[in-house]
């Protein structure tokens, strides 16, 4: 691969690289630093994050302390709600308070909810995702507004299609227009492919137009390569040209 831009090194804090060091948690805990507790009350399962003192605590990277999931007679989740550490409804990412799920033979309708469990429009411009399943894998998503009409999301597309390899790993993402055809999104490309190593970890991505030709993204590169540290986090990104 040709290097389009200089290598961009993501600065990591010294504490992140020293797992044995004391960490200042004034800003809060991430989910990976917390224990998980679960209670079941009839059809509702409540999963909470718990700090080292045994106190239910909000995980700052996912935006809630407890998620309550209601299941139907087939053990499928039909609704979930997010709560803060005090047990009050909380907006995940400041955007929505819960999700509802409706199922048919080939697809699932996922609707975003407000604090009163009513459908709400996300900041991305849609209220519901209709997701087609192929086997157990999510294949196509299309977006709908509060009136059930197809809507273009803020990224400039009406839907997306996921491609998989024989191992079931997601290898591509194609942005779709209203009719399900590939379309160039505001990111500058229509198709993004993922490169994975022998362990299945994503180590790079490349961008293509609707015809499958390499294309420059809106940020100027044709793709990226990643190097990861021992913890699995990306600590170096190399930007690529068309070759």
Describe each region flagged by the PLM.
Residues 2-15:
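Hydrophobic membrane-insertion alpha-helices, especially the h-region
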Residues 14-22:
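Hydrophobic single-pass membrane-insertion segments
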Residues 22-243:
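Buried hydrophobic residues that stabilize the cores of well-folded domains
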């Amino acid at each position: 691969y040709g290097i389009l831009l200089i290598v961009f090194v993501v600065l990591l804090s010294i504490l992140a690289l020293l797992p044995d060091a004391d960490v200042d948690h004034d800003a809060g805990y991430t989910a990976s630093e917390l224990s998980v507790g679960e209670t079941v009350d009839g059809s509702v399962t409540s999963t909470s994050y718990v700090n080292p003192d045994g106190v239910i605590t909000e995980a700052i990277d996912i935006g809630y302390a407890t998620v309550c999931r209601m299941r139907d007679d087939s053990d499928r989740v039909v609704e979930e709600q997010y709560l803060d550490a005090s047990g009050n409804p909380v907006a995940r990412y400041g955007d929505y308070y819960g999700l509802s799920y409706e199922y048919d033979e080939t697809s699932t309708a996922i609707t975003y909810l407000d604090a009163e469990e009513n459908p709400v429009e996300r900041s991305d411009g849609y209220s519901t995702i209709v997701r087609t399943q192929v086997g157990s894998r999510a294949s196509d998503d299309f977006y709908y507004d509060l009136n059930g009409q197809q809507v273009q999301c803020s990224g400039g597309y009406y839907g997306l299609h996921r491609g998989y390899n024989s191992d079931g790993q997601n290898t591509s993402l194609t942005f779709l227009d209203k009719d399900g055809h590939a379309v160039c999104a505001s990111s500058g490309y229509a198709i993004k492919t993922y490169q994975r190593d022998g362990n299945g970890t994503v180590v790079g991505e490349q961008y293509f137009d609707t015809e499958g030709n390499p294309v420059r993204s809106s940020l100027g590169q044709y793709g990226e390569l990643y190097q990861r540290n021992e913890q699995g986090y990306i600590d170096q990104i190399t930007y690529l040209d068309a070759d």
